[in-house]
A protein has these predicted regions:
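Active-site alpha-helical segments that house and flank conserved acidic catalytic motifs
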Residues: 106-135, 195-205, 243-246, 254-283, ...
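Residue-level signal for inorganic ion chemistry
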Residues: 68, 176, 207, 303, ...
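Conserved N-terminal diphosphate/IPP-binding helix and adjacent helical/loop segment
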Residues: 1-111, 119, 123, 130-158, ...
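All-alpha helical catalytic cores of prenyl diphosphate-utilizing isoprenoid enzymes
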Residues: 41-43, 57-65, 163-175, 181-280
């Protein structure tokens, strides 16, 4: 079945995890279209900025967070102590037309809200990292910068680009709350999940603050880079979406705790894979320039492990070569890759990925959930932690 056909199906409480991305895409397009209309009276200058945000959200993205939130909902209902009644506050028969209609709008609104937080995080992260491309397109701040330059406007094009990108990122963060709290899910369900929703928003920002501070103080401690992974990525990418979905559907505390732990392991493995791809990935597949972490000198777990494991000449060469920005040639980047590989860091990080993925899968299989959601979550964990993009 094609993604378009999946998106057209009525949403049911047993809809597969694989159906989430296309369904969320359709929901996002509908919400963004309405939002664009709301801004039209203000004028084209604001409307143009909203168009950049719309393009950023609609084009690309794996919809990982909505998928895990849906997994949390299904896990709660399929053996985790939850129910459709707890989620919707009415009905409970997901095959009835009224319940299906309610679920399709309310549930997909709540799932789609995660993508606005992700948009804010990525737009701001690209500014912080001075990135030029994202998902094969120009980053938001570079897009605004180019428009300013092309039109011959006053002032600094770079400052204009950063300023506008900050604002549309802030807007995305606000829209996340609007869409989530106005989703149509029951007030009781939203209240039950509110602590986890609030924690997720705080953790991702705290993780970014920590990341910037550690970069500034020059920390090369693997424990520090893992702390960034925990809060900036693992918690808000996997652990909290699973937690929020389970809480919305009324999962018992045992299931919620198990899913948080599973999510933390998958999320850490997901980010460790991202660190590997940032150095060794194929730009044609990832959509991002290879070696950016080497050019910026970002102390990821992979790089910190290389600095810890390497011999004195290797460590000296890494420190001399990291963070040279655009002065780094392709030959320089390739040399750094070779050094990192030779220290054994790449192999050690690969083992960390495998250990966390396996622990998550074993916890899922022992978690008492239904066979279908256990199998789908296992497959998703393996897909994300062994990806090439």
């Amino acid at each position: 079945m094609s993604t378009d056909e999946l998106a057209a199906l009525p949403w049911r409480l047993d809809s597969p995890l694989s159906a989430v991305p296309s369904a969320v895409d359709a929901q996002l397009k509908e919400y963004l279209s309405r939002s664009q209309e709301e801004f039209s009276p203000i004028g084209s200058l604001v409307g143009g900025a909203i168009t950049v945000l719309n393009h950023f959200i609609v084009n690309g993205g794996k919809r990982v967070r909505p998928t895990f939130a849906w997994a949390g909902i299904r896990a709660a209902i399929e053996g985790g102590g939850g129910s459709p009644d707890a989620l919707c506050g009415k009905g409970g028969d997901a095959t009835s037309s009224s319940s299906a209609d309610f679920n399709q709008g309310a549930i997909l609104n709540a799932l789609s809200a995660f993508e606005f937080i992700q948009a804010c995080a990525l737009i701001h992260d690209d500014i912080i990292d001075r990135s030029d491309t994202r998902r094969g397109f120009s980053t938001a701040h570079r897009t605004f910068e180019s428009k300013h330059r092309e039109r011959g406007w006053l002032g600094s094009s770079g400052h204009y680009g950063v300023s506008q990108a900050i604002l549309i990122g802030d807007l995305a963060f606000a829209w996340a709350d609007d869409l989530y709290n106005g989703s149509g899910l029951s007030a009781t369900a939203l209240q039950r999940a509110r602590p986890a929703w609030r924690a997720m928003r705080t953790e991702v920002i705290a993780g970014q603050i920590l990341d910037i501070a550690l970069e500034a103080n020059g920390s090369e401690d693997v424990a520090d880079s893992f702390a960034v992974i925990k809060y900036k990525t693992a918690s808000y990418t996997v652990a909290r979406p699973l937690h929020i979905g389970a809480a919305l559907a009324g999962a018992n505390e045992q299931t919620q705790s198990m899913l948080r732990n599973v999510g933390q392991d998958i999320g850490e493995a997901f980010q460790l894979r991202d660190d590997q791809l940032g150095v060794f990935g194929d730009p044609e597949v990832t959509g991002k320039p290879s070696g950016d972490d080497l050019r910026t000198g970002k102390r990821t777990t992979l790089i910190n492990e290389a600095l810890r494991s390497g011999g004195e000449p290797q460590v000296a060469a890494l420190r001399a070569g990291l963070g040279k920005g655009e002065d780094s040639t392709e030959a320089d980047i390739e040399r750094l890759r070779d050094i990192i590989y030779d220290t054994g860091a790449q192999a050690k990080v690969e083992k960390l990925i495998e250990a966390r993925t396996q622990r998550a899968i074993e916890s899922l299989q022992a978690g008492g959930l239904g066979a279908d959601i256990t199998a789908e979550l296992t497959q998703l964990a393996e897909k994300l932690t062994h990806r090439r993009f």
